[in-house]
């Protein structure tokens, strides 16, 4: 074969099967560079196949429900139960039956760049999206568990059309009789995974904004979780207006600084 390695690389990017005549022709090329390209191409196909299989697995709950006659299936998830500062955010997402974007998974398992890209894709292709945001002061009043349920209900209430079935990550909500709570649902249901991405990106962007407003806690990186830098900020600066007073490290910092007044 007279093609250069770079030309072969470009052509292989268009090939989708080992049965392709060009791929079979490359298999006769004894150059080490070509052999490496073929191996890289095979690995790429294998990864793509795994992603497609994962997509089909994650659509199984929705597929079964569509076959039962349900039309608008909402997935619900939350982010921000554990942080010491900021709101808890929930999202509810209704996806079309033919939604087939590969790569969607539990938002915590995705890179920030991948989450951001999928966030835009979901916003564009979803039938409906709702986002519930419950602030720190309400969390302190009702506790984080109840605040999380409030956020989920708020997200569901925003959906138009209304869902006729709800899939929820872990937490039983009793929003409707047609409801199923799934342990680790964000790794089992495409709708819940989509909701987890919407919720996380929304909350992360809020915390990045708060980092500019309340510097010294590293909110842009820790998103309000109790990291070393965050705890150092509490020790040296004290609390800020978005801290959750009912959470032990924040309560201790407040008591300490109040005692110095």
Swiss-Prot record:
UniProt-annotated binding residues for a divalent metal cation: 77-78, 169
Keyword annotations: Cytoplasm, Endonuclease, Hydrolase, Manganese, Metal-binding, Nuclease
Record's cofactor remark: Manganese or magnesium. Binds 1 divalent metal ion per monomer in the absence of substrate. May bind a second metal ion after substrate binding.
InterPro entries: RNase_HII, RNase_HII/HIII, RNase_HII/HIII_dom, RNaseH-like_sf, RNaseH_sf
Cofactor: Mn(2+); Mg(2+)
Subcellular location(s) of the protein: Cytoplasm
Enzymatic class: hydrolase
GO biological process assignments: DNA replication, removal of RNA primer; mismatch repair
Record CDD domains: RNase_HII_bacteria_HII_like (cd07182)
EC number: 3.1.26.4
Gene Ontology molecular function: manganese ion binding; RNA binding; RNA-DNA hybrid ribonuclease activity
Keyword Phosphoprotein attached: no
Pfam families per UniProt: RNase_HII
Disulfide bonds: none
Reactions listed under catalytic activity: Endonucleolytic cleavage to 5'-phosphomonoester
Residues covered by the RNase H type-2 domain: 71-259
Cellular component, GO annotation: cytoplasm; ribonuclease H2 complex
Free-text function comment from the UniProt entry: Endonuclease that specifically degrades the RNA of RNA-DNA hybrids.
Family: Belongs to the RNase HII family.
Record-given protein name: Ribonuclease HII
Phylogenetic lineage: Bacteria, Bacillati, Bacillota, Bacilli, Bacillales
């Amino acid at each position: 074969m007279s093609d250069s390695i770079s030309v072969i690389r470009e052509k292989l990017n268009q090939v989708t099967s080992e049965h392709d005549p060009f791929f079979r022709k490359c298999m006769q090329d004894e150059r080490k560079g070509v052999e490496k390209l073929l191996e890289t191409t095979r690995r790429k196909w294998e990864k793509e196949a795994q992603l497609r299989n994962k997509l089909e697995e994650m659509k199984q709950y929705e597929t079964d429900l569509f076959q039962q006659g349900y039309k608008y299936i909402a997935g619900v998830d939350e982010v921000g139960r554990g942080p010491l500062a900021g709101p808890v955010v929930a999202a509810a997402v209704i996806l079309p039956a033919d939604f087939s974007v590969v790569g969607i998974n539990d938002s915590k398992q995705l890179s920030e760049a991948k989450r951001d890209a999928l966030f835009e894709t979901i916003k564009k292709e979803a039938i409906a999206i709702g986002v519930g945001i419950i602030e720190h002061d309400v969390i302190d009043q009702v506790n984080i568990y109840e605040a999380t349920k409030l956020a989920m209900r708020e997200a569901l209430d925003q959906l138009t059309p209304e869902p006729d079935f709800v899939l929820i990550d872990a937490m039983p909500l009793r929003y409707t009789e047609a409801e199923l709570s799934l342990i680790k649902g964000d790794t089992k249901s495409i709708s819940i995974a989509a909701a987890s991405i919407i919720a996380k990106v929304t909350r992360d962007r809020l915390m990045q904004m708060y980092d500019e407003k309340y510097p010294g806690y590293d909110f842009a990186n820790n998103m309000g979780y109790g990291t070393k830098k965050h705890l150092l900020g509490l020790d040296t600066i004290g609390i800020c207006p978005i801290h959750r007073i009912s959470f032990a490290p924040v309560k201790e910092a407040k008591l300490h600084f109040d005692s110095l007044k």
